[in-house]
Swiss-Prot record:
Protein's recorded name: Peptide chain release factor 1
InterPro entries: PCRF (IPR005139), Pep_chain_release_fac_I (IPR000352), Pep_chain_release_fac_I_sf (IPR045853), Prokaryotic/Mito_RF (IPR050057), RF-1 (IPR004373)
Record PTM N5-methylglutamine, positions in chain: 236
PTM field: Methylated by PrmC. Methylation increases the termination efficiency of RF1.
UniProt subcellular location: Cytoplasm
Positions of region (Disordered): 285-312
Lineage: Bacteria, Pseudomonadati, Pseudomonadota, Alphaproteobacteria, Hyphomicrobiales
Summary of the function given for this chain in its UniProt record: Peptide chain release factor 1 directs the termination of translation in response to the peptide chain termination codons UAG and UAA.
Keywords annotated in UniProt: Cytoplasm, Methylation, Protein biosynthesis
Amino acid sequence: MIPFPTERLDAILARHDIVTAQLASGEIDPETVVQLSRELSDLDPVVAAIRAYRAALENLAGVEALIDEPGTDPEMRALAAEEKPEALAALETAHRALQLLLLPKDAADEKSAILEVRAGTGGDEAALFAGDLFRMYAKYAESKGWRVEVISESEGTVGGFREVVAEVKGRGVFARLKFESGAHRVQRVPDTETQGRIHTSAATVAVLPEAEEVDIHVNDADLKIDTMRAQGAGGQHVNKTESAIRITHLPTGIVVFVQEERSQHKNRARAMALLRARLYEAERNAKDSARAADRKAQVGSGDRSERIRTYNFPQGRVTDHRINLTLYKLEEVMAGTALDEVVDALITEHQAELLAAEGMA
């Protein structure tokens, strides 16, 4: 158990006192009140954990003093020896809780997310699998009380999706879904297979934190906006008004296209939200690139070409290759009810990587 630097803990406690005093003074403007209130809500659980950790340290030190002190009554020494394992366990629990709270925070974790699922290799079967994955996430979102709104979709010829993009709205969505980015592989016998042969196909998933205007500034002069009639399967026009929107961000070449709504205004708003999310992701990736070069994380690398998970239907098996996790709960995972088991394991591994990087493991 690596002890925490006293100076770091004292600095957090001192900052908590300063923020509390500033808020109590009544001498700050409303905008600063909002900022400090948000900071205080972040500091409160850390301060509580520091106090619990120090209390556990003090308790263990008292127990050990009774055991080691030559003049201690034998009966008291025996009682202290019995209490020591419990005191040590309490300290380990408090230490672990504080460890996790001191980890670097991903500013995007509390945000909603943009979910993109695209069929990969495998033709019609890949499109069907992309549809299965999207339904898995939709059911998972429903179980969490999140709201899913489709931004754009392109259906496969026999079902499923060649591509589907959706907003998943709710608090903490990105924290739970961000490790889903990557290549997902399926092994199963397609309905059209007469010989009973297992086929392998794939779909890619990208999860982007939803960006607000305060997160990323988009200059109107950098945009090329085209309007056109919405199109259905096969390219035929499905309405007579030019409600579909395509926005090109000229400096980066990023293009977004939205046609789901009948209203051009709504499609434009959704297209701008999608563009901001992609620009925000690019900015985050640029900031993270130097750190990624120093330490290649197995979890959370976000590489869309990386094969992260296999869904084997004949065996009823789901395997996440980043952490060597295998669950024989394929139906439950695809129904969204057991996806938490995979997500929780990925988060735990990511926390372990962060602890090691911070020298706290």
